[in-house]
Amino acid sequence: MKFFIDTANLDEIKAAAELGLLDGVTTNPSLIAKIVADPANFTYEDFKKHIAAICEIVDGPISAEVTTLEAEEMIREGEDLASIHENVVVKCPVTLEGLKAIRHFSSEGIRTNATLVFSPSQALLAAKAGATYVSPFIGRLDDISTDGMALVEQIVAIYDNYGYHTEVIVASVRHPQHVVEAALAGADIATIPFGVIKQLVRHPLTDAGLTKFMEDASVMKKS
């Protein structure tokens, strides 16, 4: 399973990349807003420069989301985003207009990430439209007492049934168990916040074992 980081924070991206485990990056308008010091003066050109900076750090798919709702506007903005760098993937919502845009991008060889997916039918339509990736948001489903991981399992099964090449990116990951469950479900990718990436390596028995080993090592050095 591939690991993407779900952030627009350059320091977090650099830190994750240094681990040697990072395959790509996903961003969205909310993540961009978190890192903007002066939102009133943050322009679309600033946004493009920020995406370009991410592309310089990670040699892999970098998802950048359109901020319009009509297909023609999505296409215009998406083509502009795709021109930033060959690794840019255009994120489009799975709406009727978004599906039109995804189909257009597919025909032009521009990679897409169908986002805000909450049902198997949305994922099926995204694959039919030619999406490169589809992003089910499991944490947000869990928030409303719905089994988010069951959706991932359904999408994987549907894609396997018909041989769709659309890759499943498990998004809205809240904790390490989501990552493990995504791997067990056969998802292609998990896009993970930096905090959760750091949690993946932690275990209390590992910490206890290290403490004991260091204590014993200290004794050996003194003897």
Swiss-Prot record:
Known pathway: Carbohydrate degradation; pentose phosphate pathway; D-glyceraldehyde 3-phosphate and beta-D-fructose 6-phosphate from D-ribose 5-phosphate and D-xylulose 5-phosphate (non-oxidative stage): step 2/3
GO BP of this protein: carbohydrate metabolic process; pentose-phosphate shunt
Enzyme class (EC, first level): transferase
This protein's record includes keyword Transferase: yes
Catalytic activity: D-sedoheptulose 7-phosphate + D-glyceraldehyde 3-phosphate = D-erythrose 4-phosphate + beta-D-fructose 6-phosphate
Cytoplasm among keywords: yes
SUPFAM superfamilies linked to this entry: Aldolase
Active site (UniProt): 91 (schiff-base intermediate with substrate)
Subcellular location: Cytoplasm
EC id: 2.2.1.2
Pfam families associated with the record: TAL_FSA
UniProt keyword terms in alphabetical order: Cytoplasm, Pentose shunt, Schiff base, Transferase
Annotated GO CC locations: cytoplasm
Molecular function terms from GO: aldehyde-lyase activity; transaldolase activity
Highest taxon listed in the record's lineage: Bacteria
Cited InterPro entries: Aldolase_TIM, TAL/FSA, Transaldolase_3B, Transaldolase_3B/F6P_aldolase, Transaldolase_AS, TSA/FSA_arc/bac
Family statement: Belongs to the transaldolase family. Type 3B subfamily.
General function of this protein: Transaldolase is important for the balance of metabolites in the pentose-phosphate pathway.
Full protein name: Probable transaldolase
Organism name: Prosthecochloris aestuarii (strain DSM 271 / SK 413)
Gene: tal
